[in-house]
Amino acid sequence: MSLPSPPVLKTTIIQLNKELDPEDDNNNYEILTNDYNNYGSSNTSDAGSIPTSPIIEVSGTTKSGSGLPNKKKRRRSTANIDSEELAKRKNETKQLHSIIEKRRRIKINREFEALKYLIPACRNCNTGSSGGSATPTSSTKKASTNSNNNGNKIDGMYKLTILKSSVEYILYLHHIIQKQHQLLSSISAKDTNGGILAEKLKAFEDFDIDFAKVPLNVNQYRNIDKDFNFKDLMQDLDGRSVNTESPETIIEENEPVSETSSTNNTTTLHYSNSSVLPSRTSSIVSSRQSSSLPTPELTPILSILNKYSTSNNQLNNRKNSNPISPQTVCIKSQNPSPFTMPMKSSLSTSIVNSPSSSSSLSGSKSYMAGNNAVNTVKFSLPDPVVNPNSTLNDNIPRKGLISGIPEEEEEEKINKGSANTETVNSGSASSDENNDNDRGVLLKLTDQDVSKTLLALRKSSIDSLLN
């Protein structure tokens, strides 16, 4: 007895025709050699071993009606084609591409469904609600789709999960093959009369291979023009059903409530490990556990409530200032503000009552926070650098804002201003009167010079000044 080698890829045959897939029931959709299978015919193996040349199908016949194809026509240029014909061809091409893409997605989903059916871990975790994979058929023009198979999930399971499970399952099969090969090779003629052979044969008999007894014909589900439901195959399995539970149950351990009570911990772990119990039993257990625990309403921790209390007066003030609860702890405010209404100011009484700070706290104002008065410092502006009551010396001429005034006129103004300052310093009454007259003349001349200068400037110069 010889074991077959692993299957290999067949030679791909490209068929160029207008039909997407020929409607033939005898088509072989397998891409690997199936010499190991019983239903594989000799024709299939021959076709897989001998590569064939691509077949090109050309539609159309001759004018005489014979089956011989016409000669290949030359490609016509699109210059003589109307715009309507071009739009029609583009629309047909777009529809053809959409149909091809849709059929490709259906084929991919079928393969994922086959993987989910073959892998025991995915087959047992059947989370789908109903229906199976009712893929669209040609009779309904492929208009109906199944809600269970969306872009990322196949019957409630993610495609990535199915791929990961398939890889791990293949690794498991490789491991089983290696172990069986080691057991078979270790059996020798010396063990025929002893008990070692019986133990090894018993190990083979005890190994359950029901997970591998899953019949599947790829030619059935890969024909997307026909409906195929993998749940029907699952129901046909002997001793299995659609809602088969997983052999490995998930163990959920609750955190122990009390470290000292070891009995409660053991009961909690015992009931959490047995996930097969009914929900009523689990509810009874949870009610018993909750009744044995102390409730915070009956045993409050009173020491925490009086942690920040120093005297009875402070407790009474806190109760009056905070109407939420008489047991509310009021922490000293670090950032007092009249807008936030602090409960207690961060300024101590020693600083307020000190004589050094009496001058700075003279303008203090009290703000009420509930029934407590809080003393805060009144905000005041700093002393001005320049005394507004002092008279400025108006005799000194200021620099003109307009840069268009000639420099000679500015020098004359400065000289006149210096002469006026000298007359003021002399202190005579006659010089004061002359100074006032000169000042009026200076203002008039300045206004005239400014107006003349503005009129003399061009528009571009004005724009540059404004900018």
From Swiss-Prot:
GO cellular component terms attached to this protein's record: nucleus
Gene3D superfamilies reported in the protein's UniProt record: Helix-loop-helix DNA-binding domain (4.10.280.10)
Residue ranges, compositional bias (Low complexity): 257-275, 312-322, 345-365
Traits of the deletion mutant: Decreases cell adherence to silicone substrate.
UniProt xrefs under SUPFAM superfamilies: HLH, helix-loop-helix DNA-binding domain (SSF47459)
Functional description taken from the UniProt entry: Transcription factor required for yeast cell adherence to silicone substrate.
Protein name, per record: Transcriptional regulator of yeast form adherence 6
Organism: Candida albicans (strain SC5314 / ATCC MYA-2876) (Yeast)
Gene behind this protein: TRY6
